């Protein structure tokens, strides 16, 4: 039986990569009906958006999509198609296995860890205001009323939402993944020493969730120390769960 799959080739190196992917899939003998849909800068003139509604409808219908890289303008222009897809379909868990391969040239052997990253909130949520916007002035006044020293008048602002519900959802996902896949430890990665309200909330929820999984070891690490640990001894890690920014 053939499977219906949406293919979004993307732009730049995207079409080349997705063509190679199709050859690999064809070599397996699995029958795929490719529903090719275009998104990105190449469709802006025609549809006025990098992610037309008919692309979203196609993905919703098949429930499976493979996407090549899509250009995101730096500092200006349309927002990331990747982020838009994640938010539209509530694709809250970005799961990245990291596994040593023969001949990879790394000085580390037998690396086998999984990064579980929250995909829908934090600074990547896209709540931003340009310098000079009325919202920036309103936020400045709000900060002043709270008794804190406000920011410079010519600032641009990004808002960092971290919620209890979405923190719990991603941490529970990480623990359930660990349990299902025979993993032994979950590490919550954060910057709660500085961002006490937001990352502090994430860490507090992670600790609460961890108490429900006594069969899985839990610890937490500041993101700076995590990065150092990953390059010094990646074998110390198993499953890492972290907010969207990291």
Predicted regions and their residues:
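Extreme N-terminal starter segment of soluble prokaryotic enzymes
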Residues: 1-5
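Solvent-exposed alpha-helices and their adjacent loops that cap or buttress functional pockets
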Residues: 6, 57-59, 105-109, 149, ...
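Glycine-rich phosphate/diphosphate-binding loop of Rossmann-like nucleotide-binding domains
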Residues: 6-27, 137-224
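Buried hydrophobic positions in well-ordered alpha/beta secondary-structure cores of metabolic enzymes
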Residues: 11-14, 63, 116, 174, ...
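N-terminal beta-loop-helix "entrance" segment that forms/cooperates
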Residues: 31-53, 228-230
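Short, small-residue-enriched loops and turns at beta-alpha junctions
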Residues: 43-45, 73-74, 193-197, 228-229
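N-terminal glycine-rich phosphate/adenylate-binding segment common to multiple enzyme folds
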Residues: 45-145, 156-158, 245
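Glycine-rich phosphate-binding loop
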Residues: 58-73, 210, 215-246
